[in-house]
Amino acid sequence: MVKKTNDRSNMRKIILALILSLMSSTTFADGHSGKIDLKGFFAADAKFLFNEKGVGTFIYDGMGGLMAMSGTFGDSTSQYCVGAGSIPGKGVEMGHCTIKFINDDTAMIYFEIPLDNTMGGKFECLGGTGRYEGITCSGETGYQQIKSAVEGKIHATNYYKGTYTLKQ
């Protein structure tokens, strides 16, 4: 009788350990947080305003596509952005982008990019719709301008690298 009790006790411990193991695995692999690693292309209409000394400002309104460089977050998304900055390149360029995911849900981000280091900016999520409602995110962003084939347009490659958490 003592052996049966020990066997039952051991079996209970094993089952309890399995249950706890499954619960903790689910907690860490819940899909509610992860890394952002996106790269893409951006094209926009731009307007420039200068004074007689060459000091001025620029504004733009455009869109582009993004793809995930690692993982799947944000793969095959599009972005629509508006922004502004100063010329000559002192201060920051700032703006907002709406990221549209493949399932039609969106996330809105705010960004600031130093004009003397266009690959060294920061971004953060302001909110989202659908699955991305309540999203929080932050990280690094930047761009490398490409010589435009058309006057009044800007073209660039850009990136977002950071982390996100979805509302549970």
Regions found by a protein language model. Give the residues of each.
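Positively charged n-region of N-terminal signal peptides that target proteins for export
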Residues: 2-14
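Short, linear, compositionally biased motifs with a strong N-terminal bias
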Residues: 20-21
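Beta-strand-enriched cores of mature, soluble protein domains
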Residues: 30-168
